[in-house]
Amino acid sequence: TEEVFTDNLTTYYRSIILAGPSAKGQELAAKVNTGQKLTWDDLNSATWAVMGASSASGYIYPSLWLYNNYGKQISDLANVVQSDSYTTSMSRLAAGQVDVIVGFAHMRAKYAANWMSKFGGTDDCYKQTAVLAVTDQIMDDTICVSKNSDIMSEGFKKAFADACINIGKSEDGLKVLNVLSHIGYQYAESSDYDAERAAQNMLKK
């Protein structure tokens, strides 16, 4: 399935584990595309390109996916190289320098036009790559309040949330939010951030 950009707003994004055109990448893709579950040995036999350890989509959440499925993390993989950008990761994947990369779920949609013209791919990006896994939701920026503050009553929190949401409903408000690259807010539940809590707990181990 090809990823496409839409005008729909969302409160989260995801990360993907993406196999490329190398022999190992295609071997892993073939297993997934025929409904077979990848083993840890399968994944550990590949060369991975990842981002820095503080990157949510380029390291933390793919590592959490590995932890939840295999009890392992990116740091346990035998062959890992760090990229300085997602452009570099995609270039390495297209050139067959690495077998697998990790990053935000719309990587292919963003870089597909450059796959052959700049990155060295020999066929269409979507034909030469395959999604091996999709991570938990990575929540976008959030406005939080303290649980320990005396003034944070349920009524105040509701009024504060309403005020923040209303900012995004006017043109003047959107101009203010543009400084943060935000285009609006939605109500959230504490449970929306369970995956983030799991990620933070994993990082402590």
State each model region's role.
Residues 73-91, 137:
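Short helix-initiation/N-cap motifs at beta->coil->alpha
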Residues 1-16, 118-161, 180-184:
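Periplasmic-binding protein-like
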Residues 47-56, 79, 147-150, 182-187:
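Second-shell loop/turn segments in exported
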Residues 2-56, 64:
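A conserved helix-loop-strand patch within extracytoplasmic ligand-binding domains
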Residues 151-205:
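An extracytoplasmic/periplasmic, membrane-proximal ligand-sensing/linker region
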Residues 5-6, 23-25, 53-57, 87, ...:
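Solvent-exposed loop/turn segments at secondary-structure junctions
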Residues 61, 65, 88, 92, ...:
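Extracytoplasmic/secreted proteins, especially bacterial periplasmic and envelope-associated proteins
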